[in-house]
């Protein structure tokens, strides 16, 4: 009858179809969220696995216009040797003075590579550095480095604790330089969501994203391993079996003896279980048994 047909049409249009549509949309959203998180994790892993440039002296260059370009001279181990600032761009245009300062730093500290951040004024800074190297026949090269997340790290409690006497921009120049020397050690200090290699993170389920990214970072760190003599607490916290208490014990012991020469020395400060869980991911580069 027409009443039954009308009832069927109404129920399909008003109840059944919207319900099916919501269910399909929900399934697709869940799938899209999973794919996006997997993509985010994969990108983070690939970035962290960028090969380090060991044994090079770096000049970290954080470009800017009005506030000036911040410079950080780093030795082969990433230790800060000098901090400076130049104003080669608008509105100052102190090109000659800036060029003299770059030449002075490169020659004084035997700089191998100048790491230029890819943010504001990056193109102008690249042109300035290229001309400076060419005009003065400097024996160094320059590289453009992603500075995504550098500002986040520079303003963090970790950065303030590490460099309490420097301002945010100066810490950023240090971070840019260290990213070239050892990307893994530097990038683990930054929340993976701030590195800028995935979709807009606030569109994704935060708990699932945090867990996936934490797992990705931990997997990379344990896959590569860490040099116990140079690793920061930010890096050590991802090593299987270690926690804040054991990390503090390792750092205290390292400060006491200056450097570890054998992994067996860790047995003095780690329990048998923790030693068993963590030792496979710890390296001592100049030891007989790495």
Language-model segments: residues:
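Gly/Thr-rich phosphate-binding beta-strand-loop-beta motif of the actin/hexokinase/Hsp70
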Residues: 52-80, 180, 271
């Amino acid at each position: 009858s027409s009443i039954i047909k009308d009832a069927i049409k109404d129920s399909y249009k008003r109840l059944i179809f919207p319900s099916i549509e919501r269910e399909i949309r929900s399934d697709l959203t869940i799938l899209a969220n999973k794919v996006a998180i997997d993509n985010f994790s994969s990108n983070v892993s690939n970035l962290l696995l960028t090969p380090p440039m060991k044994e090079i002296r770096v000049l970290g260059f954080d470009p800017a216009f009005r506030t000036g370009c911040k410079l950080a001279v780093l030795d082969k181990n990433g230790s800060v040797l000098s901090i400076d600032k130049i104003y080669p761009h608008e509105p100052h245009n102190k090109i000659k003075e800036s060029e003299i300062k770059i030449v002075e730093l490169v020659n004084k500290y035997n700089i191998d590579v100048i790491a230029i951040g890819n943010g504001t004024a990056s193109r102008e800074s690249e042109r300035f550095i290229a001309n400076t190297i060419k005009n003065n026949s400097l024996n160094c090269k320059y590289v453009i480095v992603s500075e995504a997340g550098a500002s986040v790290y520079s303003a963090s409690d970790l950065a303030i604790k590490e460099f309490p006497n420097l301002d945010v921009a100066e810490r950023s120049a240090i971070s840019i330089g260290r990213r070239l020397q050892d990307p893994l050690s530097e990038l683990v200090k930054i929340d993976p969501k701030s590195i800028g290699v995935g979709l807009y993170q606030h569109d994704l389920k935060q708990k699932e994203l945090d867990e996936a990214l934490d797992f990705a970072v931990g997997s990379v760190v344990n896959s590569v391993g860490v040099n116990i003599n140079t690793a920061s607490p930010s890096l050590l916290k991802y090593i299987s079996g270690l926690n804040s208490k054991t990390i503090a014990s390792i750092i205290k012991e390292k400060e006491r003896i200056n450097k570890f020469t054998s992994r067996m020395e860790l047995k003095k400060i780690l329990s048998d279980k923790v030693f068993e869980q963590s030792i496979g991911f710890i390296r001592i580069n100049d030891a007989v048994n790495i």
